Amino acid sequence: MKNNQEYILVVDIGNSYTKIGIFEKEKENTTSIILFPTDSETNIATLSKKMNVFKKYNIKHSIVGSVVPKLKPTYFKTIKKMFNIEPYYISETTKYSFLIDESPNKELGDDLKALCEYCVSVNKNCIGISFGTAIASVYLKNNSLVGASIAAGLGFGLNKLIEKASLLKKSKIDKFSSDFFGTNTISALESGINNLRSGFAYNFYNQAKKDNLNSDLKCIITGGESYNINISSFEYEINKEAILLGFKKIYFLNN
């Protein structure tokens, strides 16, 4: 056992990747975190090996968010077996620090609800943008969810393009490139990735700002692809763990 400090285990199961982190109950920085590809056929034995790194911590709380519903029972059983606690799951009766209408409450993914929760902890007027398998954004006005926008992710689109273009199949694309203008096919693709990231954030922010001209609108950017965002027209915060933190906040709001 690491110490007597209580920890919360937070699980975010995405379509492509699963991220698991632990936090001290009273802190917002992750103590330990693991990331691995989501496997719809995973089992208790496999998960137990992955999460064994957390056994040394005094884990007394847990929340599991998932956009892959079939995996929830496996995670429930694994966490209960390893830590002797029952994880909390988001449901239609879950309370939030923001207002959400009935329809989006039923349809919006757990991860985006967690992003909303983190956003309103920063400011009552806020947009959150997640760059991952999908590009997703949420807009909150006066602590109320106005709406969201979802598009195919950069990695998915790039992989499909490389599959179709024979000249690109042996080329290495640097998704971390910050160049705005490409001088050949590869650097042009790298420029496109950079401009798509920054352009999506810029446009979504501006549309929200038009709807809320007199507010101090904040912008939170997160997700595995949230790097090299080049925007000078407004301030933004990049927090890779915003969604995990949102789940943590949801847990303690409901328990």
Swiss-Prot record:
Keyword hit for Nucleotide-binding: yes
The residues that hold ATP are 12-19, 133
Which residues are responsible for catalysis?
Answer: 111
Record-level GO cellular component terms: cytoplasm
Annotated substrate binding sites: 109-112, 185
- Disulphides: none
Annotated catalysed reactions = (R)-pantothenate + ATP = (R)-4'-phosphopantothenate + ADP + H(+)
Give an example GO biological process: coenzyme A biosynthetic process
Specify where it is mainly localized. Answer: cytoplasm
Q: What is its EC number?
A: 2.7.1.33
The cofactors required by this protein are: NH4(+); K(+)
State which pathway it belongs to: Cofactor biosynthesis; coenzyme A biosynthesis; CoA from (R)-pantothenate: step 1/5
Q: Which Pfam families match?
A: Pan_kinase (PF03309)
Keywords of the record, alphabetical order, are: ATP-binding, Coenzyme A biosynthesis, Cytoplasm, Kinase, Nucleotide-binding, Potassium, Transferase
What Gene3D superfamilies would the database entry show? 3.30.420.40
Cofactor mode of binding and number, as noted: A monovalent cation. Ammonium or potassium.
Asked if the record carries the keyword Kinase, the reply is yes
Where does the UniProt annotation locate this protein?
A: Cytoplasm
Q: InterPro entries annotated for this entry?
A: ATPase_NBD, Type_III_PanK
Quaternary structure and interacting proteins, as annotated: Homodimer.
Q: What family does the Swiss-Prot or TrEMBL record give for this protein? A: Belongs to the type III pantothenate kinase family.
What does the record give as the function of this protein? Catalyzes the phosphorylation of pantothenate (Pan), the first step in CoA biosynthesis.
UniProt protein name: Type III pantothenate kinase
Please name the source species. Answer: Malacoplasma penetrans (strain HF-2) (Mycoplasma penetrans)
